[in-house]
């Protein structure tokens, strides 16, 4: 009798595990700082509906597989070559080209001491402010960012000031929540604002998680979905999941390919 009961229980456990590893992020941005296991099938990250944007391949460094199973990214700038080694980025990972892009352009980096990019880690709001500032070519501003939880001696204060001054990010209830994790939808909203909130065409009819998109984020997600910034080919783009570093890298590379790097 016990053996008969054990079989369906084991089947259910296997199904649960399969469902857990299919996504590339936590289902809620408040659940933690790491993303779940991602799919290891390489996709062409340049293959999207955009045909009029920039060719961001010109931004890429030379990426080669290393003995650890990771990659070495060699970037040439001002006649000098610098090689970045990441043991946690497989050469055939769906985000490998995107990591190459953000590292080559200086928008993102990893832990050079441990040789880790940490692609599955979540991105804090303060970290995203720094990333977008670099990506868009932000410049220092004299404006203050007045939030109850934001001191002017924080390392990210100047970046947050610029983001807030440009209307790209804001707070909630007078607080900025710098250490809070950004969701996929929130990251997309910021980039939509950076793009100047272009007129939206298309629908979310074929987006699997459309019912989970907030009303305030609907235009941004519709824009991202219909312009190929997010697809279901590489991983799950669940609106409320904590966006991962790999996903941010991919968003930025596709944004650049679509309309170029620009300041708000």
Protein language model regions, located:
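Sec-dependent N-terminal signal peptides of Gram-positive bacterial secreted proteins and lipoproteins
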Residues: 4-26
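Feature responds to low-complexity, polar/acidic, surface-exposed segments characteristic
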Residues: 6, 26-96, 109-129, 133-157, ...
């Amino acid at each position: 009798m016990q053996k008969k009961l054990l079989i369906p229980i084991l089947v259910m456990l296997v199904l649960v595990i399969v469902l857990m590893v299919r996504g590339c992020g936590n289902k809620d941005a408040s659940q933690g700082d790491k993303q779940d296991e991602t799919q290891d099938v390489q996709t062409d990250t340049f293959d999207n509906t955009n045909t009029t944007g920039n060719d961001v391949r010109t931004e890429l460094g030379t990426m080669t597989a290393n003995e650890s199973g990771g990659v070495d990214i060699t970037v040439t700038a001002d006649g000098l070559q610098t090689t970045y080694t990441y043991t946690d980025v497989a050469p055939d990972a769906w985000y490998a080209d995107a990591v190459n892009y953000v590292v080559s352009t200086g928008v993102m980096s990893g832990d050079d001491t441990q040789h880790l990019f940490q692609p599955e880690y979540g991105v804090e709001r303060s970290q995203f402010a720094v990333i977008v500032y670099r990506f868009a070519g932000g410049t220092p501003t004299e404006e203050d960012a007045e939030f109850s939880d934001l001191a002017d001696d924080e390392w990210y204060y100047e970046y947050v000031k610029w983001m807030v001054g440009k209307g790209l990010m804001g707070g909630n209830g007078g607080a900025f929540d710098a250490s809070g994790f950004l969701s996929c939808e929130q990251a997309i909203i910021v980039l939509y604002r950076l793009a100047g909130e272009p007129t939206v065409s298309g629908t979310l009819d074929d987006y699997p998680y459309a019912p989970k998109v907030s009303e305030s984020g609907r235009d941004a997600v519709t824009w991202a979905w219909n312009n190929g910034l997010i697809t279901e080919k590489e991983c799950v783009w669940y609106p409320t999941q904590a966006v991962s570093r790999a996903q941010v890298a991919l968003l930025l590379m596709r944004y650049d390919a679509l309309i170029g790097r620009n300041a708000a």
